[in-house]
Design a protein with these regions (language model features):
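Aromatic- and Gly/Pro-enriched helix-to-coil junctions and flexible linker segments
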Residues: 4, 22-119
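Sec-dependent bacterial lipoprotein signal peptides
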Residues: 1-21
Length: 119
C-alpha cells in the first residue's frame, strides 16, 4: 500500500512539474522589452516573423508592404500600423493569426516614440 501511495505521489508531482514547465512564455516576455529599439536590431525581425508572409511585394498584393525600413515607417504614419497591431478600434487585429505578444508590441511602440531610428 505504501508503494502505491509513493508511486501515485510521484505521478502527481511529475504531472505538476510537466504542466508548470509548459508555460507559453516567449523569449520576449521572459527577457523583457527593449527600451531603445531600432528598426534593424529589433523591429525588422518582428515584421519578418509576423507580417511579411502577407505584406511582401514578392508574395502578396496586401498593402501596405512591410519589408523595408521605409515601408514600415510609412505604414506606421499612413496606415495606422500600431493601432492595427494593438487591436484597437481601427480595424481587424494584425496579424490575422492572432495578437502579437505585449513585449513585441511595446518594442514597436518604443521605436515609434523615439522617432523611428533605423540603426
Amino acid at each position: 500500500m505504501k508503494k502505491i501511495k509513493l508511486a501515485l505521489l510521484a505521478l502527481v508531482a511529475g504531472v505538476g512539474i510537466s504542466l508548470y514547465s509548459c508555460e507559453s512564455n516567449t523569449y520576449e516576455e521572459v527577457a523583457g522589452v527593449v527600451e531603445n529599439p531600432t528598426y534593424n536590431a529589433n523591429v525588422k525581425s518582428i515584421m519578418q516573423d509576423k507580417c511579411t508572409s502577407c505584406h511582401a511585394e514578392s508574395t502578396s498584393s496586401q498593402d501596405p508592404y512591410l519589408e523595408t525600413y521605409d515601408q514600415v515607417k510609412d505604414a506606421c504614419v499612413n496606415y495606422n500600423l500600431l493601432c492595427r497591431i494593438q487591436g484597437s478600434d481601427c480595424g481587424d487585429v494584425m496579424p490575422t493569426s492572432g495578437k502579437m505578444p505585449a513585449a513585441r508590441i511595446k518594442i514597436i511602440e518604443n521605436w515609434i516614440a523615439q522617432g523611428y531610428p533605423e540603426n
